[in-house]
């Protein structure tokens, strides 16, 4: 009788099949966890988003808009008058946010921008008292890649200012920020990070924006927009966010935001713009820091 040949096993064949199955299972598990995380974040963010959307819808009624914005201005504390070296009155650090009557606030483009900003804020890595994310930035000259903490020198504080030319509060308060640069640059470093446009001409358009700039499609577009800003802030270092918006994502910086970093730690985290973007809070922090270094200085009123 002929003997049947015994089955031959190829060494490693079963191991390779099991390895491939394990890789697929691991990938499926990671995708499932990511999906669950995104779903949970949407459930957390959705009530907040709905509240913002409802407020924008209300503000499209001009009578409500004028009443609410007027009441907000009246509720603000009286601004202390500051004089420059020539005895002239210095404009306030945080002029009130103005919204023209012809601007619609509750549109599909505005809701997309609001959702994008709230999502970045929810997933940001930066938190006050925690380590500062060393996210990637790009030099406008030569497109050389660097990192944010490359601009931190020793124990000196580093002030980060995120924004874009089409953001009215950011541009309205640039002169106040520039005054801080001039006054404290001996002991403090400052860095402007140009991020995606807040109100691009092909997105959420506002007539209050001083410039009409479309959303950036390339680094060249972002450089062109940043050059406009650089003319108004010649004394401050300026870099670009990457086209993947790595710095804006890490710091939750859209529409605009302020941070202070010292020794790799976030010492101050400003609120999200427009309402939370307060140059006066940075000034207060720097005044306290300056007093620690040099003692209290007399203030002229």
From Swiss-Prot:
Cytoplasmic compartment spans: 1-41
Location in the cell: Cell membrane; Endosome membrane
Catalytic residues of the enzyme: 167
Predominant localisation class: membrane
Domain of life: Eukaryota
Keyword Cell membrane: yes
UniProt keyword list: Cell membrane, Endosome, Membrane, Oxidoreductase, Selenocysteine, Signal-anchor, Thyroid hormones biosynthesis, Transmembrane, Transmembrane helix
PANTHER family: IODOTHYRONINE DEIODINASE, THYROXINE 5-DEIODINASE
Protein name per UniProt: Thyroxine 5-deiodinase
Originating species: Bos taurus
